C-alpha cells in the first residue's frame, strides 16, 4: 500500500479562481491601454505645438514678422521651410524628428497635418497666427475648434 499524503497540487477550484482573476485583469488592461495611448498622443501633440510656438517667437524676434503663409493647406509647409530651412547656412529655429514630418508637412501624433495660418482668425494667445491639430478624429469642422482639436489659442 502506498500513501498519497505526500502529493501536493492545486484543486480544480483554485485553478479556476486563478484563471478568472487573470481574465479580469486582462480585460481591465485591454480597456485602459487605448485611453492611455490617446492621452499620450494628445500630450505629444501639445508638446510639439509648444515647441513650434517657441520657434515661431524666435523667428519673429529675428525678422519682426511671423513666417508667411499660403493657403490653409500650404501654410504648414511655409512654416516648416521658415523654421527648418534646407539651406545648411540658414538659421534653423527647430529640429524635427523624422516621424514629425512628411515632406514639408509637420504631422501630429496621429499622422495628420498640422494647420498654420498667418494672420490668424481666432482669438489667439499668441496674437497673430493660428496653429492647430485636428486631434484624434482627424477632422476639424470649425477651423480648429472641434472638441478634440488641439490649438494655440485655447491652451
Predicted regions and their residues:
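N-terminal single-pass transmembrane signal-anchor helix
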Residues: 2, 6-36
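Short, surface-exposed interaction loops/tails
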Residues: 3, 38, 42-43, 50-61, ...
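Generic leucine side-chain signal with a strong bias for well-ordered alpha-helical environments
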Residues: 12-16, 49-52, 83
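Short, glycine/small-hydrophobic-rich surface segments
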Residues: 56-104, 123
Amino acid at each position: 500500500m502506498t500513501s498519497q499524503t505526500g502529493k501536493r497540487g492545486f484543486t480544480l477550484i483554485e485553478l479556476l479562481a486563478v484563471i478568472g482573476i487573470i481574465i479580469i485583469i486582462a480585460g481591465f488592461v485591454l480597456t485602459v491601454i487605448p485611453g492611455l495611448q490617446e492621452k499620450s498622443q494628445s500630450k505629444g501633440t501639445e508638446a510639439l505645438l509648444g515647441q513650434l510656438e517657441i520657434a515661431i517667437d524666435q523667428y519673429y524676434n529675428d525678422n519682426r514678422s511671423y513666417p508667411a503663409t499660403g493657403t490653409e493647406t500650404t501654410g504648414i509647409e511655409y512654416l516648416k521651410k521658415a523654421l527648418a530651412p534646407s539651406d545648411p547656412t540658414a538659421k534653423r529655429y527647430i529640429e524635427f524628428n523624422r516621424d514629425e514630418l512628411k515632406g514639408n508637412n509637420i504631422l501630429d501624433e496621429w499622422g495628420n497635418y498640422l494647420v498654420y495660418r498667418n494672420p490668424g482668425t481666432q482669438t489667439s494667445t499668441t496674437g497673430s497666427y493660428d496653429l492647430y491639430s485636428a486631434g484624434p478624429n482627424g477632422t476639424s469642422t470649425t477651423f480648429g475648434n472641434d472638441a478634440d482639436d488641439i490649438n494655440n489659442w485655447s491652451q
